[in-house]
């Protein structure tokens, strides 16, 4: 079994206080192994991006632990510890147009992390790093003097990927990196991410709402609903044997590229009130080897009979 790089234990993230308190994530538990792509899938507002932002330190946590390489990272950190984490953990944002500084050249955008953390000794070394990174993500060296608005959406996302990977990170959080792109460009960006992972030994947390996309790139998938992770399994296991009703409803909504089969398929509608957790409280349980489901004792017995 591969070594755990990231581990989330009993994580809760809330915003506001008192009557205005909103719990965005509750009882989140999962781990990410070195070198794998772990996907977090859910609808808009489910809390998936909130978890990603908490891991990188952009969101505060209310309780629970986030461990990176065995060390707790969501508590107080010294400046040197924080800087080391920023270098090791990078993020690719959803909207490339909004996440890039429109007033800065591509050269400066990609170099900013190198400047901030003194990751080069000479100007020639910096230029060489940037030139190599541009080539790796499929951009030309003459693009360095241009500004973000001069590029297409796919090219802007490649700039965002270059900005993250030039730091030579170990772990990359990809927050819906293709949702703002044209369909024709999405496969190119996904293939680029997979190639960079293979070449550099990267570990990914891939955040998305499209199950057909995560099937292509993921080793394991966690399904999240209203701040609660309801199911975690290896990719093909989850697609072939979904157990939680919410996962079943998500999978039933994935389009089938066959008009006859698409018309014949039955949509599964998820009703949260079908769960009775008043007395019999749920927890994350391993129903099958490496297949975890959020359920109480009555549901566990029901799911096991259906296997």
Curated annotation (Swiss-Prot):
Belongs to the ABC transporter superfamily. Keywords: ATP-binding, Cell membrane, Membrane, Nucleotide-binding, Peptide transport, Protein transport, Translocase, Transport. It comes from Streptococcus pyogenes serotype M1. The keyword Transport applies. This is Oligopeptide transport ATP-binding protein OppF. ATP binds at residues 42-49. One of its GO terms (biological process) is peptide transport. It is a peripheral membrane protein. SMART domains: AAA (SM00382). Its EC number is 7.4.2.6. Part of the ABC transporter complex OppABCDF involved in the uptake of oligopeptides. Probably responsible for energy coupling to the transport system. PROSITE patterns: ABC_TRANSPORTER_1 (PS00211), ABC_TRANSPORTER_2 (PS50893). Residues 6-251 form the ABC transporter domain. Its main location: membrane. GO terms for molecular function: ATP binding; ATP hydrolysis activity. It is found in: Cell membrane. It catalyses: a [peptide](out) + ATP + H2O = a [peptide](in) + ADP + phosphate + H(+). The lineage of its organism: Bacteria, Bacillati, Bacillota, Bacilli, Lactobacillales. The keyword Nucleotide-binding applies. GO terms for cellular component: plasma membrane. It holds the Pfam family oligo_HPY. The complex is composed of two ATP-binding proteins (OppD and OppF), two transmembrane proteins (OppB and OppC) and a solute-binding protein (OppA). It is an enzyme of class 7 (translocase).
């Amino acid at each position: 079994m591969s070594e755990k790089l990231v581990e989330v234990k009993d994580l809760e993230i809330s915003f506001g206080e008192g009557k205005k308190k909103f719990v965005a994530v509750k009882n989140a538990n999962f781990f990410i192994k070195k070198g794998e792509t772990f996907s977090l899938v859910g609808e808009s507002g489910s809390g998936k991006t909130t978890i990603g932002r908490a891991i990188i330190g952009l969101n505060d946590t209310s309780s629970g632990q986030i461990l990176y390489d065995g060390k707790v990272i969501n508590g107080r950190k010294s400046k040197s510890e924080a800087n080391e984490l920023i270098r090791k953990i990078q993020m690719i944002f959803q909207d490339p147009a909004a996440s890039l500084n429109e007033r800065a050249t591509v050269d400066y955008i990609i170099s900013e992390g190198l400047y901030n953390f003194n990751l080069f000794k000479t100007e020639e070394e910096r230029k060489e790093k940037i030139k190599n990174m541009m080539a790796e993500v499929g951009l030309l060296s003459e693009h360095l003097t241009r500004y973000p608005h001069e590029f297409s959406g796919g090219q802007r996302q490649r700039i965002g990927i270059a900005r993250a990977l030039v730091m030579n990170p170990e772990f990359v959080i990809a927050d819906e990196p293709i949702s703002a792109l044209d369909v024709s460009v999405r496969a190119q960006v996904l293939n680029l991410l997979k190639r960079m992972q293979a070449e550099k030994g990267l570990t990914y947390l891939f955040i998305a709402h499209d199950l057909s996309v995560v099937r292509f790139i993921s080793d394991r998938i966690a399904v999240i609903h209203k701040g609660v992770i309801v199911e975690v399994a290896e990719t093909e296991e989850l697609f072939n044997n979904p157990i939680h009703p919410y996962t079943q409803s998500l999978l039933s909504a994935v389009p089938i590229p066959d008009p006859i089969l698409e018309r014949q398929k039955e949509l599964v509608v998820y009703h949260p009130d079908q769960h009775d957790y008043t007395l019999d409280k749920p927890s994350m349980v391993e129903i099958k080897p490496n297949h975890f489901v959020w359920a109480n004792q009555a549901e566990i017995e029901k799911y096991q009979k259906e296997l």
